[in-house]
A protein has these predicted regions:
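Charged, amphipathic alpha-helical regulatory modules used
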Residues: 3-118
Length: 118
């Protein structure tokens, strides 16, 4: 199994694939909350099924972490403060997540927070 939580760039050649996989995991519409293996294999046919499964697992975990982090924050924080907390949490747990994906995770988390909590 791969260790995708490491932040070191030199030992982390799959950062681009991880971010693409996370982008796929966050797609709304018919692919929402669906596994990413088939879609990921279209862009990266060199990946084995074991690798595709590992990418799916870690990307789904990163997405859930981002959504849960935003959803569970206390009331009264500004959007900027909430994003900074999400950014800090992702830096610890999923340091490979790109700035663009962090922003999208924040937006999705805020949507669910607003939808469920008002």
């Amino acid at each position: 199994m791969f260790n995708f939580r490491r932040r070191k760039a030199a030992s982390f050649p799959d950062e681009e694939i991880l971010n693409y996989g996370l982008k796929l995991a966050m797609e709304f519409g018919k692919n929402w909350l669906q596994p990413i293996q088939t879609r990921l294999s279209k862009k990266h046919p060199e990946l084995t099924m074991e690798q595709l499964d590992a990418y799916n697992d870690i990307c789904q975990k990163a997405m859930k972490c981002g959504h849960d982090c935003v959803y569970s924050m206390e009331s009264g924080l500004t959007d900027k403060q909430m994003f900074e907390r999400l950014d800090a949490q992702l830096s610890v747990d999923f340091g490979w997540v790109s700035r663009k994906n962090r922003s999208k995770l924040f937006s999705q988390g805020m949507y669910y927070r607003w939808k469920d909590l008002g």
